[in-house]
């Protein structure tokens, strides 16, 4: 195996070509990739990172649409690296995209990350050579990079999805996908704005547009069962009070299902009286954030009656905020549209109140579907509505889209699209049979979409780094997932998924938002602590489930 050493700054300047073979090439400069870069470099690996964007931050580099912000409270939406949290102060409890960029730039300065990153480097293809046991990675406008191992940290939102609507190319106004928003911003003041989609970005954009746009029309297929954010501005004194509590909060992240510092209640909703249930639900509601979703009764995502209790409480709270009963029925129907919590809820600040404004209209596309787009606007069965700006808040080809968008080829000439055509198969959510020496973080069949991003970045990052150290210490130059092991991993996920209420919601969690995509759990839904335990079980047995060769 090639000796692993650290390259100098002169050898790997920012945006310079990589002129030597690497031990590890990292793809993606979000929380996960940067964490691995920092620690692998400290451990003496010859490592470099490439990213398609012009700056670090991953999703927070690309997402700068109006209202874009974190849906996790700032205390745990950060690295647990002491030199960062001890010095950085947050301005809001739920930071917006601009604050997140400030945080990443602060981390870059403190940890000296950019010297080992090539920006504006979008990976197009990669081919594995069995003879050299190396990947050759190609991107437009750059020299090929050779690396013993590649770790792709592409996130679950790397591949935006825009619906195929007839006539979009004829529209004379502006149109954008929220994930590809112009970095210079877009002025919505005084404009007629259409927002297609009511996922998290749709909710956030709608709130902001309603403040000063002339007219806002929200096209909704499924209502977002959003929760109150309870935003708060933070002073220097607030930050000072928070800091002593952070180490314990970081420690709790690895012990809670979704990598937060709170977890489900060890009580069943069906076993409590109505008064007891209401008291608990009221407390969760008033706490704000995701507690109503992820600190609720332990049975509500598995038992339909328990789920009804949770939904009905939410419904009644929301309907009280909406003046028009017909609009209330579309936004918070008397009968739940799907099990509550089976789709990721957005956190909102004044979303439901905007529909009481004269300049905001809600269109249910189940009743009046979008037929086409014209040069002036959008046509439904009720006629044409004219717009100056169309916003596609239509989400992503989530979780797998980042990997399938790159033409990774093994020495049988297969791509991820080929081997996953009948469903995802991975071992521990980090590798797929047929692709030796290619690992991925925050990817398919990992906690990813069910986990706080920084928690996943650190815990899974540590597990991958321990794996890399094992390979180095034992002179192993080739690792590949075993087919039998990944079948067992996939069955574990499928069995749990099918025992829950999640399959009853058409969601990106199972790929049902993308036409033609196989419907299956894209993530590991058994929780972060179980994931860590399963990974460690493999490690204790010399990484059982992988084929290793010197």
From Swiss-Prot:
It comes from the Bacteria. GO terms for molecular function: cyclopentanone monooxygenase activity; flavin adenine dinucleotide binding; N,N-dimethylaniline monooxygenase activity; NADP binding. FAD binds at residues 31-32, 51, 60, 71, 77, 123. The record marks 344 as: Transition state stabilizer. Keywords: FAD, Flavoprotein, Monooxygenase, NADP, Oxidoreductase. It holds the Pfam family FMO-like. Its EC number is 1.14.13.16. It catalyses: cyclopentanone + NADPH + O2 + H(+) = 5-valerolactone + NADP(+) + H2O. Gene3D superfamilies: FAD/NAD(P)-binding domain. Disruption phenotype: Cells lacking this gene are not capable of growth on cyclopentanol or cyclopentanone as a sole carbon and energy source. One of its GO terms (biological process) is cyclopentanol catabolic process. Its cofactor is FAD. Pathway: Alcohol metabolism; cyclopentanol degradation; 5-valerolactone from cyclopentanol: step 2/2. Belongs to the FAD-binding monooxygenase family. Homotetramer. Catalyzes a Baeyer-Villiger oxidation reaction, i.e. the insertion of an oxygen atom into a carbon-carbon bond adjacent to a carbonyl, which converts ketones to esters or lactones using NADPH as an electron donor. Converts cyclopentanone to 5-valerolactone, a step in the degradation pathway of cyclopentanol. Besides cycloalkanones, can also act on methylated and other alkylated cycloalkanones, and on methylated cycloalkenones, with high enantioselectivity in some cases. Cannot use NADH instead of NADPH. This is Cyclopentanone 1,2-monooxygenase. It comes from Comamonas sp. (strain NCIMB 9872). The gene is cpnB.
């Amino acid at each position: 195996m090639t000796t692993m050493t650290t390259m100098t700054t002169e050898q790997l300047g920012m945006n310079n070509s990589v002129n030597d073979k690497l031990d590890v090439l990292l793809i993606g400069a979000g929380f996960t990739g940067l964490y691995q870069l920092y620690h692998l470099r400290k451990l003496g690996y010859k490592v470099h990172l490439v990213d398609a964007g012009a700056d670090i931050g991953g999703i927070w580099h690309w997402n700068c649409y109006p209202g874009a912000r974190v849906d996790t409270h700032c205390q745990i939406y950060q690295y647990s690296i002491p030199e960062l949290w001890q010095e950085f102060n947050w301005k809001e409890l739920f930071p917006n995209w601009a604050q997140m960029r400030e945080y990443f730039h602060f981390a870059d300065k403190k940890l000296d990350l950019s010297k080992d990153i090539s920006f504006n480097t979008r990976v197009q293809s990669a081919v594995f050579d069995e003879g050299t046991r190396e990947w050759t990675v190609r991107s437009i406008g750059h020299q090929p990079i050779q690396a013993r191992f590649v770790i792709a940290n592409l996130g679950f939102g790397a591949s935006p999805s825009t619906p195929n609507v007839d006539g979009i190319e004829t529209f004379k106004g502006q149109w954008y996908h929220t994930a590809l928003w112009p970095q210079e911003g877009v002025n919505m003041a005084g404009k007629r704005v259409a927002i297609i989609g009511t996922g998290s970005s749709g909710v956030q954009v709608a709130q902001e547009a309603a403040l000063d746009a002339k007219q806002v029309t929200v096209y909704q297929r499924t209502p977002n069962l959003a929760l109150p954010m309870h935003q708060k501005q933070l002073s220097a004194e607030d930050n000072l009070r928070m800091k002593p509590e952070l180490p314990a909060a970081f420690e709790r992240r690895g012990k809670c299902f979704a990598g937060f510092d709170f977890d489900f209640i060890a009580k069943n909703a069906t076993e409590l009286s109505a008064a007891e249930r209401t008291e608990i639900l009221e407390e969760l509601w008033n706490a704000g954030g995701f507690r109503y979703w992820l600190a609720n009764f332990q049975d509500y995502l598995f038992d339909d009656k328990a789920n009804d209790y949770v939904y009905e409480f939410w419904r009644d709270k929301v309907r009280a905020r909406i003046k028009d009963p017909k609009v209330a029925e579309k936004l918070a129907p008397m009968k739940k549209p799907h099990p509550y919590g089976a789709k990721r809820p957005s956190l909102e600040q004044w979303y439901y109140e905007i529909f009481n404004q004269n300049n905001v209209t809600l269109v249910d596309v189940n009743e009046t579907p979008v037929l086409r787009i014209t040069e002036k606007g959008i046509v439904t069965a009720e006629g044409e509505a004219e717009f100056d700006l169309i916003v596609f808040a239509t989400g992503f080809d989530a979780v797998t889209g980042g990997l399938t968008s790159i033409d990774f080829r093994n020495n049988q000439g297969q791509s991820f699209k080929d081997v996953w055509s009948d469903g995802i198969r991975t071992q521990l959510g980090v590798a797929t049979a047929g692709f030796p020496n290619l690992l991925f973080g925050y990817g398919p069949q990992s906690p990813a979409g069910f986990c706080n991003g920084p928690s996943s970045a650190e815990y899974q990052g540590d597990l991958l780094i321990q794996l890399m150290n094992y390979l180095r210490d034992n002179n192993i130059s080739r690792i590949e997932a075993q087919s039998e092991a990944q079948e067992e991993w996939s069955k574990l996920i499928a069995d749990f998924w099918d025992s829950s209420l999640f399959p009853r919601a058409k969601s990106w969690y199972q790929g049902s938002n993308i036409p033609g995509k196989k419907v299956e759990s894209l993530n590991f839904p058994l929780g972060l602590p179980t994931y860590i335990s399963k990974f460690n079980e493999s490690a204790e047995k010399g990484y059982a489930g992988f084929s290793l060769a010197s």
